[in-house]
Amino acid sequence: MALEYLEQEPWRFLISSATVIFLVLNIAAVLTLAERKVSAYIQLRYGPNRVGPRGLLQPAADVVKLFIKENVSPGRADRWVFLAAPIAMFLPAAAVWLVIPFGPGMVVADLNIGLVYFFAITSIGALGVIMAGYGSRSNFSLLGALRGAGQMISYEVPLILSLLGVAMLTGSLSMVDIVEYQAGGFWNWIIWPQLPMFLAFFVSGLAEVKRIPFDLPEGESEIVGGFMIEYSGMTWALIQASEFASMAVMSAVASTLFLGGWQPPLPFLDLGVFNWLWLGIKTTLLIFVFQWIRWTLPRLRMDQLMDLGWKILVPVTILWLFVTAGAMLVI
């Protein structure tokens, strides 16, 4: 009887969703170590090297430390909104993984509107930032939340436009169909005809994740941590996990839509059921670029951030949509 229940679609979806959340939390923990190691490499340091061999157990030590820290809520805070905000930030980052295909038949939910689902879920992240700023009842938190909301909503526009070209080329909104469209070798990857769109998507992804040079909602040197200033312990850890999970999911989506997803760069490198390794390699490389930018570029001013989004990325993506449409008509 238990096996019959597990074969039913709701149970399968719930188990798959729980597995995805567990994996996302572990990915976020590993990325904290990767972030420290990359920053140490860039700054000619060793990085964490005390806990476990070569510091590999540092994430476990961090989790234990954060578990035993007290979760302090400000006296004036709207408690339920304050505590719900980290969850509202983390769940969208985890939910996107449900539609990312890791290999042939390896997807939790193969939606025929996968791109629309991605747009809808990522836009919810701004709500969590607003909840954190409003629920904290702190001027710095509120200012950071307003910055974050303006930034994330502004960069949703070029983010969506950058993926319309992909949908036009493939004729589908399903991520599985888009990956299968890129089969046959790296010369069939969508990044080549859609290079400006890929760059626009990547820059918009940086802004959506709120990473340097787009970390104005946090801005430690300006607004003392922004919307995160009143959080501590595991609530603070969940916000950090949502940031790292968002970075990983943006890299995975970029790899899926522009770099062939699970498709190998050359046909003879096909690994069959282990093709998910190719998606992992591509995603890891893009995560490294995220971290490289984080530790080498300064923060932009608010006016520079808005100018980049509205005056450069939006016109470029609209122009390339017309170029793509014209090329499809001619060819």
Swiss-Prot record:
UniProt GO MF annotations: NADH dehydrogenase activity; oxidoreductase activity, acting on NAD(P)H, quinone or similar compound as acceptor; quinone binding
Q: Which reaction does it catalyse?
A: a quinone + NADH + 5 H(+)(in) = a quinol + NAD(+) + 4 H(+)(out)
Q: Which residues cross the membrane?
A: 13-33, 80-100, 113-133, 159-179, 183-203, 249-269, 273-293, 311-331
Q: Which GO terms describe its cellular component?
A: plasma membrane
User: What membrane topology is annotated for this entry?
Assistant: Multi-pass membrane protein
- Annotated S-S bridges: none
- Entry's EC annotation: 7.1.1.-
Q: Which GO terms describe its biological process?
A: aerobic respiration
- Keyword list, A-Z: Cell membrane, Membrane, NAD, Quinone, Translocase, Transmembrane, Transmembrane helix, Ubiquinone
Give compartment(s).
Cell membrane
Q: How would you classify this enzyme at the top EC level?
A: translocase
- Assembly: NDH-1 is composed of 14 different subunits. Subunits NuoA, H, J, K, L, M, N constitute the membrane sector of the complex.
Would you identify the family this protein belongs to, as annotated? Answer: Belongs to the complex I subunit 1 family.
Describe its function. Answer: NDH-1 shuttles electrons from NADH, via FMN and iron-sulfur (Fe-S) centers, to quinones in the respiratory chain. The immediate electron acceptor for the enzyme in this species is believed to be ubiquinone. Couples the redox reaction to proton translocation (for every two electrons transferred, four hydrogen ions are translocated across the cytoplasmic membrane), and thus conserves the redox energy in a proton gradient. This subunit may bind ubiquinone.
Protein name as it appears in the record:
NADH-quinone oxidoreductase subunit H
Q: Which gene encodes it?
A: nuoH
